Amino acid sequence: LIQNLVSYLVQTRKFTVLDREYLNHMNSELNIITTNQTNIEEIVKLGQKLFSDYIMVGTLQKLFTEEKTIKIKNSNNSVSSKKAFIEFSYRIIDVPTSQIMFSDDYTGVFDIEEKDIVSLEGYIIEKASLEIGSTILNAIYPLRLEKISGDTAYIGQGGLEIVIGEEFTIIELGEKIKDSYTNEYIGREQKEVGKLQITQVSAKLSSGKIFQQSYNL
């Protein structure tokens, strides 16, 4: 599951993901550099590469399948169905402040057609990682319009997150809203001003045609 999440988050081009294998390798290089009394600038450069902005911690709580067979009334025939269930709890922690940026208890339920599946476990994990990865991405980096030219809008996100033909509502952000108790910034005013349909997707950028708007965007 973790490796699938890593692959998903990397292809979004929004995250540089450091895994344990990478960190162990970099720590070994750092030890070599410091032992050989290398220039301090090189040590600083390498040290900077080891720093991460966020840490994800999670627990896979459940992963199982369930099969049900229903007998058709007044017949000797029956119909079987199989579903997969997965539960995964996780948190995204901001390293500098130790604050929990986002947390979620994910539950996935998937219909299974085994004739089309090579690895059942791999199928469940792949489906779940796409949904979890999308939730993480939208929580930390929500989709934004980077540019509007005529009736074409450009979104600063591509990859697996955006699909040609998909439709989105365009939201205009207003004044900031603060929690009256903590004085913490909790969001902004939102106003629906249009809709667009995706026409093109690349690794970093997507574009779509605006087919509905409240005013000339």
Language-model features, listed with the residues they occupy:
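C-terminal soluble interaction/assembly domains
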Residues: 167-216
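N-terminal segment of the mature soluble domain
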Residues: 1-59, 95-103, 163, 171-182
